[in-house]
Amino acid sequence: MSSSIGIDLGTTYSCVGVWQNDRVEIIANDQGNRTTPSYVAFNETERLIGDAAKNQVAMNPTNTIFDAKRLIGRKFSDPVIQSDMKHWPFKVIAKEGDKPHLQVEFKGEVKTFSPEEVSSMVLLKMKETAEAYLGKTINNAVITVPAYFNDSQRQATKDAGAIAKLNVQRIINEPTAAAIAYGLEKKSQGERNILIFDLGGGTFDVSLLTIEDGVFEVKATAGDTHLGGEDFDNRLVNHFVDEFKRKHKKDLMTNQRALRRLRTACERAKRTLSSSAQASIEIDSLFEGIDFYTSITRARFEELCADLFRGCLDPVDKVLKDSKLDKKTIHEIVLVGGSTRIPKVQQLLQDHFNGKELNKSINPDEAVAYGAAVQAAILSNEGGAKVADILLLDVAPLSMGLETAGGVMTTLIPRNTTIPCKKNQTFSTYSDNQTGVLVQVYEGERAMTRDNNLLGKFELTNIPPAPRGVPQIEVTFDIDANGILNVSAEDKSTGNKHKITITNDKGRLTAEQIEKMVKDAEMFKAQDEAQREVVESKNKLENYAYTVRSTIKDDKIAAKLSKEDRKTVEEKSDEAINWLHANDSATKEEYEKAMKDLEAVCSPIISKVYGQQGGENPGNFSGAKTTEEDLD
C-alpha cells in the first residue's frame, strides 16, 4: 500500500486516489461520494468542507467559498478576477498589494483568507478522506494542476499543500495524469499519438502526447485556465435572470440567496441537457414570493454557449501546430473532465477530426486523481513492477525569458520545452561603466515584455565599471519537475552570483506567512474537532431523552412501573428536551452534565422493568448510538 496519495484539486470538485493491491483505489468520502465539492463554508458555530459546505450554500451564500482555484496565483486587478466577482456571492478584497483575499464572517467575527488557505482546507479534507480509508496518517501527496497554469499558480498550489501539512512530492499536469490513467494498461501497442481534451468545472487543457513502452512524452500543451462548466452555468444564470426580469419586472441580481438557488437549478438543468433534449426549472418562491417555473431546450443552451464551445477548438489547433503533427496522425482523442459530457462539445470535436470516434474509456471525473495516484506510487517506490517502467516527460506551457534593452522579451526557454530543463545565456551591459543590472523575468509568448506576465526581478550589483558590452553576465533559467522556475545570474569576471526562486513580486507567500497559516489550520482543525464533540454529546442527550420517554409510553413496559416512576421519567425527559431546545449552543460539558443527571434518575427506574423480565440490564441504554441520521 502506498503511503503517498494523488489529489486532483479541482475548481468545483476534488478527488483522491491511492495505489493499493497493485491498482489505484479512488477513495469515497464520508458521504460515500468519490468526488468532493471544493467548497468551504463558515457559520456561527463551525467550518464546513466539501458536501456539508455545498449543501448549505443557499442558506449561507456570502460565507460559502468556492472557485478558490480561479483566484490562486492571480492578482486582484486581473480582469478575469474582476469579471468573476460579478458572479460570486462571497466578498473578495485586495490585501498585501494586489493579492486577492476572501472575506467571511466566522463565529461572529470578520475573517480573511488567502486562496492558498482555502485550497489547503479542501486538500486537508482529501487528506482526511484518505486517512480514514487507509487507517493511517498520510504526509506525502502528488497534486495536479491545469497544464496551462503559470509559474505563480503552480507555486501557490504547492504552498496550499504546505499549509495542509502535506509534503508535495510533485505538482503534475492534469492532462498528463489523465494520460497515465488511459495508458497504464496499454503498453504494447507501439508509439501512439494521444490528444487529451480536458474540460472541467473551471479550467480547460489540451495536451498532445506520444505514448510508447511506458514513456509518456508531452509534445505540446495549450488551454485556458479560465474556461469550464461554471462558465456555461453563468450563461444559463444570465439567461434566466433576463427572463425573470421580463416576466416579473424584478432583478434577481439584488438577492444572493435567490441567485444561488437559481445557479444550483441551472447546474442541474445543464446536466439534464446532456441526456435529454429539454430541461425544466422549478423553483418555489424564488424571489419576493414568486415561483419560477420555466424550461430550456438543448438547442437554446448550445446557442447561449456557442462561442465558448467553438473556442474549445483553438487550443486543439495550437497543439497540433506546435507539435507539427497532422490531425490524421492522432490515434486517440481522450475525453477528460465532467464538461466533456456535453453532446455539442463532443460533436464539434469529432467534426474537427473528420468524424473520428472519441475515446470515452476512462472515467472523466476520476482519471486525473487516478494518474496522480500512480505518480505518487512511483515517487514513493511503492508501485511495483506494474509502474516501474513508466516515465513522464512533461513540458513548460509558457515561454520564459527576460527583458532586454527596449523592453524586448528575450526567450530562454521556449514553450513546450521538456522539463526539468536548464538553459543559460550570456548578456552584457547596456551603457558604459554600468555597475548593476536589473534582471526582470517574464513568461508569455508576446514580443514585448509589457504584454507578458512579470514573474519577478532582482538586481545583480557590484559589476566592475567597464565599457558597455564588456562585462559577461550569465543568466541561468532552471525549471524543475513541478514546472517551477529558479533563476540565477553570475558576473563571470567577479564570480558574483545572485540566485532566486522567483518569489514575492508575483504575490507568493513568504515562509513566515505559510508558517502562520499552518498554525491557523491546526487551530481550525482543533475547533472543528471540538465542535464535533459538542454535537455528539448534544445528540447523545437528545437520543436518550426521547428513547426513555417513548419507552415508558410502551404499554407493556408502563404496566410494570408505578405511577410515580412513570411520572418522574416523563417529567425529567420532558425537562431535558425543553432544556435542549432552550440551550442550543451549550458547551460539551453542559450537555454531558445534563445527560448524567437524566441518567441518574431514569436508569434505575428503567432497570426495574428489565430486572423483572430477567433480561439483561440495559444500564446505559443511552445506548441509542448517535447515527448519521441524527446529525443535522
Curated annotation (Swiss-Prot):
Ordered alphabetically, the record's keywords are: ATP-binding, Chaperone, Cytoplasm, Cytoskeleton, Nucleotide-binding, Stress response
**An example Gene Ontology molecular-function term:** ATP binding
Q: Which GO terms describe its cellular component?
A: centrosome; cytoplasm; lipid droplet; phagocytic vesicle
Using the UniProt annotation, give all residue ranges assigned to the region (Disordered): 609-632
InterPro entries, A to Z: ATPase_NBD, Heat_shock_70_CS, HSP70_C_sf, HSP70_peptide-bd_sf, Hsp_70_fam
Q: Which domain of life is it from?
A: Eukaryota
Which Pfam families does the record match to this protein?
HSP70
Q: Please indicate if the UniProt record lists Hydrolase as a keyword.
A: no
Entry keyword annotation includes Cell division: no
GO terms classed as biological process: chaperone cofactor-dependent protein refolding; protein refolding; response to bacterium
**Family that this chain belongs to:** Belongs to the heat shock protein 70 family.
Q: What is this protein called?
A: Heat shock cognate 70 kDa protein 2
